[in-house]
Amino acid sequence: MATAASNHYSLLTSSASIVHAEPPGGMQQGAGGYREAQSLVQGDYGALQSNGHPLSHAHQWITALSHGGGGGGGGGGGGGGGGGGGGGDGSPWSTSPLGQPDIKPSVVVQQGGRGDELHGPGALQQQHQQQQQQQQQQQQQQQQQQQQQRPPHLVHHAANHHPGPGAWRSAAAAAHLPPSMGASNGGLLYSQPSFTVNGMLGAGGQPAGLHHHGLRDAHDEPHHADHHPHPHSHPHQQPPPPPPPQGPPGHPGAHHDPHSDEDTPTSDDLEQFAKQFKQRRIKLGFTQADVGLALGTLYGNVFSQTTICRFEALQLSFKNMCKLKPLLNKWLEEADSSSGSPTSIDKIAAQGRKRKKRTSIEVSVKGALESHFLKCPKPSAQEITSLADSLQLEKEVVRVWFCNRRQKEKRMTPPGGTLPGAEDVYGGSRDTPPHHGVQTPVQ
C-alpha cells in the first residue's frame, strides 16, 4: 500500500496533482489555530480534478476548518491539508491545552485518488516533529507573499446554498471557499458532528463560530447582499408584527359602534323596568292579555298573555327581554299620557277583553241551588233552564255552578268510601255510575 507523507491530521496528496504547491512558507502555529484574512490567496484554491471521487468516502476527515486552512492545500478542501510544496509543511491543528498534540487519524490519497487508508498516531507524531522546524521558518515568508497576492473576495458562505440541519459539511470550512468552488464542489465537504476541535464544533455538529472575526468584519457585508438571509448573519432581524387584537368570541358587539353598548340594558335595568311596568299596568287597569293585544295592534308584534307574564317575572331570556323592553316602554308612555280619556289603547283593550265579569250569587239563591244539588247532582238541560228562570239567573250561570259543585264533591269524597248520607243522595239517581253505589267502609 503506497502512501505519501501526510501532515498531522490529513494532508491530501495524489499523483494526479490534486493540490497545487505554493512557495515556501509555513502557516501560523498557535493555540487558536486561526489565520488572518491576508493569509488566504486565490492560488490556494485550485480546482479539484475529477479523478474518481476525491473526498468521497463518508468518514473522511475534514482537516481544514476555516480558522486553520493549510498553506497550499486549498484544492483539497479549503486549505484543509496544509502541504506547502506538495509534501506537507505544517499542521493546521492546534495542540491540546495540556501541551500534547491532538492525535486523530489522517487520510492519505493513493495513486488512484482514493483516501480510504488511515494511519495511526505514531507516524503522525514523527511527521509532526519534522514539520514543526520548517513551519517556523516559513511563517513570515508565507504571510508577506500572501498579503501581496490576496484577492478582494475570499469569503464565500457556501452554507447559504445548502441550508438545513441535515447538511454534513462544516460551515467553517465552507466559509473560505471561493464562489466557484462553493457552487460546484460544496457538496464534497463533510464534517464529523461527534468531535470537537478547540470548541469550534459542537456536539451536534453545529459550528460555534463560522470564521475569524477579522474575516467576518471585512467580507460579510458585501456578500450578504448577494445571498439569501442567513440566521447567523442577521441577528437583529425584526420578527413579524403581531396580529391585531380581537375581542372575545362571546361578545359580538366588540367591533360595533361604541354607542351600541349604551343601548343594551343590563340585568338590573331590566329587573327595575319589569317591576315598574307591572305596577303601572295594574294601576291603569290593564291585564297582561290587554298589553299583548295592544302591542300587536299598534306595533305589529303580537304577544300572548303568557309572554307578558314571563317578562314581568323575569323568566325570559336576556335577548328576548332586551327586545321586548322598548316596546313595553313605548306602550307604557302612551298609556300614561292618555290616562283619564278614552284612547285607542282603551278601545283595543275593550275589544280584547273576552273574559266575563265574575258572577256573585246571593246567599238565598245559593241555598236553593244547594238543595236542588242534593236531590239531583246532575240535572238535565230542561231542569237547568227551569231552575234558572225560577231563580232569575242566566242558564250558563246555573250550568257552571252545578259543574263546579260536582268537582267540589269529588274532592271532598275520600278514595275508600263515601260521605255519610251519600247513599240517600245517589241511591235514587238514574245517572249514578256503578262505582258510586253503597260501599261498606273499611273498619
Curated annotation (Swiss-Prot):
**Residue ranges, compositional bias (Low complexity):** 125-149, 161-171
Describe the protein's quaternary organization and the partners it interacts with.
Answer: Interacts with PQBP1. Interaction with ISL1.
**Taxonomic lineage:** Eukaryota, Metazoa, Chordata, Craniata, Vertebrata
- Which positions carry Phosphoserine? 341
Bilayer-crossing residues are: none
User: What is the protein named?
Assistant: POU domain, class 3, transcription factor 2
Q: Name one GO molecular function term.
A: identical protein binding
**Which tissues does the record link to its expression?**
Expressed specifically in the neuroectodermal cell lineage.
Q: What job does this protein perform?
A: Transcription factor that plays a key role in neuronal differentiation. Binds preferentially to the recognition sequence which consists of two distinct half-sites, ('GCAT') and ('TAAT'), separated by a non-conserved spacer region of 0, 2, or 3 nucleotides. Acts as a transcriptional activator when binding cooperatively with SOX4, SOX11, or SOX12 to gene promoters. The combination of three transcription factors, ASCL1, POU3F2/BRN2 and MYT1L, is sufficient to reprogram fibroblasts and other somatic cells into induced neuronal (iN) cells in vitro.
- Record keywords, A-Z: Activator, Differentiation, DNA-binding, Homeobox, Neurogenesis, Nucleus, Phosphoprotein, Transcription, Transcription regulation
One GO cellular component term of this record is: nucleoplasm
* InterPro entries associated with the record: HD, Homeobox_CS, Homeodomain-like_sf, Lambda_DNA-bd_dom_sf, POU, POU_dom, POU_domain_TF, TF_POU_3
Please give the positions of the paired cysteines in each disulfide bond.
none
Location within or outside the cell: Nucleus
Q: Where is the signal peptide?
A: none
Q: Where is this region: Disordered?
A: 64-171, 201-267, 409-443
Name one process (GO BP) from the record: negative regulation of gene expression
Which segments show compositional bias classed as Gly residues? 67-90
All copies of domain POU-specific, residue ranges = 262-336
- Identify its protein family: Belongs to the POU transcription factor family. Class-3 subfamily.
Q: Where is the composition biased (Basic and acidic residues)?
A: 215-224
Regions of biased composition (Basic residues) lie at: 225-235
Where are stretches of biased composition, namely Pro residues? 237-251
